Amino acid sequence: MSNENHEELNDQLIVRREKVDTLREEGIDPFGEKFIRSISPEEIETKFADKSKEDLEEAAIEVSVAGRIMTKRVKGKVGFTHIQDRFHQLQIYIRKDAIGEDAYAIFKLADLGDIIGIKGTIFRTNTGELSVKATEFTLLSKSLRPLPDKYHGLKDVEQRYRQRYLDLITNEESQNRFVMRSKILKYTRDYMDNQGFLEVETPVLHTIAGGAAAKPFITHHNALDMELYLRIALELHLKRLIVGGMDKVYEIGRVFRNEGTSTRHNPEFTMLESYAAYEDYEDVMDLVEGLVSTVCKQVNGTTKITYGEYDVDLTPNWRRIHMADAVKEYVGVDFWNVTSDEEAHELAKKHDVAVTEHMTYGHILNEFFETYVEEKLIQPTFVYGHPVEISPLAKKNKEDERFTDRFELFIVGREHANAFSELNDPIDQRERFEAQMKEREQGNDEAHGMDADFLEALEYGLPPTGGLGIGIDRLVMLLTDAPSIRDILLFPTMKHRD
């Protein structure tokens, strides 16, 4: 911003504050009281769209409306303004002799961005525009700062994220996207409820960071003098509830991971996790397919959508493929016939797949998949059969114990869900926790810790269970064609300004 523009902005701020002082000197509160609205600009548009000028004159319908001033022009004793409420604008016609000299003086002091209340009658102008002829004018809130770019929106993308309130005032697409987010959450809950799941709440503060491979945020409880972790997953507490006999449960809540940010990652984000007793990962595939396709149809009116450059068909009967088969199909490497960790390391070197010393067969297969396959899965695809090394909470596959009964859902090259037949053998679970702790000692700081209380719960008996995790934010991105996770979080995490 140039010095001249900076001074101009300061001048505007000063003038608006001077107007506040002027109003107060006249005994007028610039930040008014409750105002009862009888109708919104949107309702006027829809209810009276087919009414003629003569119809409205004869009916003389009195209304009470409120909104933010977006345009204003005054000529002598007559003025026009457009007020906005949720991106529906309504023209207000104001005459000095109709609202009185004092009220008209206040109107003349009004600036773009001020919030006003109007009482009057609906009419149609000679050009056919639905309007309200004011009989009363009330200032409800004085705007001390001018709206950006003459209310045409914020040009600076980062400013949109930092000052979301301005983005919502000036960007209809952004506001609509957040309305859709709320609907997606509602329809998701409706679907889960209709499938017989019970919504529950579990702790945000954990004594052990478990349920996912991620770095936690650490805090300290002063009274108990103990370290606690903001949860990185919902899983382990929900599975305790299955042990307790709550057969089908789900939770939608915030989780926290002390990791980097990107167009797909925010340190705090919203997860849906669900667990159903006596089911397996194939049942969960059916649940996910039904949930995503149903919610998509409810918010978009169709299961065929566009995301960026891709046309995506979410109609059920999605593709299902084993991870080893996917690597064989897309890369030409057959991991079914790899018999040792050494052979896997040689393949990684040959195909330029980055690996570390502690990685074994399963880690390397997964690295091949993430390097060469994941981004190619545009249409909804369930990839199942994840290696046991990267799935410490999933049940081993009976036919080949190198793999687990686990799947991830990929759409437009991104993971959208993670699910498995839950490991319910407490002895096997303890061994896997121990293996994870060895990985941590070897430098994998995202490996799971030992959760003794969870192991004790498993020892009382966890029935066969199908578990699911869906990233709500990525689902919202997909269904609203949002390029960045910051576009669908009202207040994304941002680095401090210098």
Curated annotation (Swiss-Prot):
| Residue positions binding Mg(2+) 1 | E408, E415
Q: Where is the signal peptide?
A: none
Q: What is its EC number?
A: 6.1.1.6
Origin superkingdom? Bacteria
Q: What keyword terms does UniProt attach to this protein?
A: Aminoacyl-tRNA synthetase, ATP-binding, Cytoplasm, Ligase, Magnesium, Metal-binding, Nucleotide-binding, Protein biosynthesis
Cellular component, GO annotation = cytosol
Pfam families under this entry? tRNA-synt_2 (PF00152), tRNA_anti-codon (PF01336)
GO biological process, alphabetically ordered: lysyl-tRNA aminoacylation
> What are its cofactors?
Mg(2+)
Q: Where in the cell is it found?
A: Cytoplasm
Per its UniProt entry, what is the enzyme's top EC class, as one word?
ligase
- Chief subcellular location: cytoplasm
Cofactor binding description: Binds 3 Mg(2+) ions per subunit.
Question: Reaction(s) catalyzed by this protein?
Answer: tRNA(Lys) + L-lysine + ATP = L-lysyl-tRNA(Lys) + AMP + diphosphate
Q: GO molecular function: any one?
A: catalytic activity, acting on a protein
- List of residues binding Mg(2+) 2: E415
Concerning NCBIfam families, the annotation shows:
lysS_bact, PRK00484.1
- Subunit details for this protein? Homodimer.
Regarding protein family, the annotation reads: Belongs to the class-II aminoacyl-tRNA synthetase family.
Designated name of the protein: Lysine--tRNA ligase
